[in-house]
Amino acid sequence: MTILNHTLGFPRVGLRRELKKAQESYWAGNSTREELLAVGRELRARHWDQQKQAGIDLLPVGDFAWYDHVLTTSLLLGNVPARHQNKDGSVDIDTLFRIGRGRAPTGEPAAAAEMTKWFNTNYHYMVPEFVKGQQFKLTWTQLLDEVDEALALGHKVKPVLLGPITWLWLGKVKGEQFDRLSLLNDILPVYQQVLAELAKRGIEWVQIDEPALVLELPQAWLDAYKPAYDALQGQVKLLLTTYFEGVTPNLDTITALPVQGLHVDLVHGKDDVVELHKRLPSDWLLSAGLINGRNVWRADLTEKYVQIKDIVGKRDLWVASSCSLLHSPIDLSVETRLDAEVKSWFAFALQKCHELALLRDALNSGDTAALAEWSAPIQARRHSTRVHNPAVEKRLAAITAQDSQRANVYEVRAEAQRARFKLPAWPTTTIGSFPQTTEIRTLRLDFKKGNLDANNYRTGIAEHIRQAIVEQERLGLDVLVHGEAERNDMVEYFGEHLDGFVFTQNGWVQSYGSRCVKPPIVIGDVSRPAPITVEWAKYAQSMTDKPVKGMLTGPVTILCWSFPREDVSRETIAKQIALALRDEVADLEAAGIGIIQIDEPALREGLPLRRSDWDAYLQWGVEAFRINAAVAKDDTQIHTHMCYCEFNDIMDSIAALDADVITIETSRSDMELLESFEEFDYPNEIGPGVYDIHSPNVPSVEWIEALLKKAAKRIPAERLWVNPDCGLKTRGWPETRAALANMVQAAQNLRRG
């Protein structure tokens, strides 16, 4: 029984973000469709070859996506919303881009599909839309075309296909409501057709992803698995693939399925390998997800060997990444600025492939010498002074309940804030960032590369902040922001100014579409050596009589959008960050900043996948926010911002944050999200986002007014704010001016009644 290895997927964007650049060039009309397609082919060929050279036996095909793999699956099944369809019924790459972005080089612009987080990761998918009576058919053959590509290059491949039940689970019904699970029998023939086509190509194994099987699914959904997979069996071997959690709670459902193998995440799940082995059918292959696909840490391979060795030789076994390597940067070897000690602690996607090769070889041979050598740096890290800061640990241990309480309740604070700011009804503001122009990016890059001295850099940033204030005053906004010209990313910026973080040069991971982020890495205890945001906030406030918001990223979001340590709990990291940012709130307040926004867009996405684990997480997540904010005086207004959220099941926790104002992303869901706040009788102020900043389309005054009137039916108008869904850094100035002008006009119209 020779053990093989494989990955569940590989990063798509390219080491230098080649895919992002090609997409954006095509969208801007600066390159042709053929040129875009050529970049995709080149990246796929390179990535297959890199995995093969690193020692991977079975290469994933179908993990590449032009925007998002859930959207790719939707097109495969012919699931195209009516507003995005081509007149002749055909489907092409622009159809895909219109669904994702609301517009493309061809076709009519229309509202983009809703976007939300992929399970509890920082990747986003486009939510499939279902309407009653819709038809499904194989319309987008990208998977088959890419399999042909890989086979022509001589690779041994394993196609990757998002499973039918997970795909349905991830979608939403639009219009007349019905049970979306009723569509299952309509999509299975398309899956059968795809599997038949793969069988014709001589494919032995297909990785069929059903991560919904790690959730606490309703019984009807669990019951749907057996008939669905009865319909799919027989043409190729199916590797039922799960990740992000363990499968033990749903193992009875899984073991009844007519599949030939099961992949389990042995990093994030709590499944015991020996118990799994006992419960799985003896002829099934077990794919052991031993290498963390979601983090950047070098694996302790001696530990991984011990974890799996007891079942070696007892069943067919593969070793694998826990999930797709999509969530990891590509290659550590190009990181030239990390010092040798810290660099020795990490492994990116290509290094994880190498880890899988080392592990496979050791399991096949029994020789573990190479594993011990590989694991030595991560074992040495446990005693590094770079990791432990006694002062931080002491401060954390001294936290009391009082440290997470504002001095007075919201009603008292609101009165003090009204007296201080005297804002009109329907106050207008933005979420924080303004367009990151080429000039701004060049300025930061020149400074980073040493081509610009500190004085000239600061002069340049000051000018961009001045322009942002002038623009907002001209537009008539009520509460201003400084625009964040100095910030490359809302998390990276704070990480750069906090001890305990390190940064990469090329550690890009895909967030959605062409958007990539370069998450900081938490390597040790977190503290704040000096004020971070005070200087620029104070400068911006000096230029206007209107209030300027101080802008902070909250502790849970910094945690969730960074690569965390694996040697302490997430709670510990979040509270260390909260204490550091608490000092920032105090310093902003002392500098005369009266409104401070602490963004927590990631609060919900950090939820454990199983509801039974939620309470513990929400308790420390809320406490971290309150530790951060509680130092503020009564007349300092604390805002928070959240996006991509379904709120109804965590409203208690959102209220417990005790922010004076919460701004939320609601426009893509047509204000549906406000139902939760209405039903809960949310007591504080709310700014429901009135337009979608992820699309370049400019909303009309009438559209915004209609949304605000809809909001006012649910929330008293005196508690409503008017703002976009999210920050504006990815937009251009022309559409930003136009959209904000319409937003301000809509608010003014409503004030006049």
From Swiss-Prot:
Cofactor(s) needed by this chain: Zn(2+)
Pathway connected to this protein: Amino-acid biosynthesis; L-methionine biosynthesis via de novo pathway; L-methionine from L-homocysteine (MetE route): step 1/1
Co-factor note (free text): Binds 1 zinc ion per subunit.
Residues binding L-homocysteine: 431-433, 484, 599
EC number: 2.1.1.14
Disulfide bonds: none
Binding site residues for 5-methyltetrahydropteroyltri-L-glutamate: 17-20, 117, 515-516, 561, 605
UniProt: Zn(2+) binding residues: 641, 643, 665, 726
Alphabetic keyword roster: Amino-acid biosynthesis, Metal-binding, Methionine biosynthesis, Methyltransferase, Repeat, Transferase, Zinc
Active site, renumbered: 694 (proton donor)
GO biological process, one term: methionine biosynthetic process
Binding site for L-methionine: 431-433, 484, 599
Reaction(s) this enzyme catalyzes, per UniProt: 5-methyltetrahydropteroyltri-L-glutamate + L-homocysteine = tetrahydropteroyltri-L-glutamate + L-methionine
Family: Belongs to the vitamin-B12 independent methionine synthase family.
Protein name per Swiss-Prot or TrEMBL: 5-methyltetrahydropteroyltriglutamate--homocysteine methyltransferase
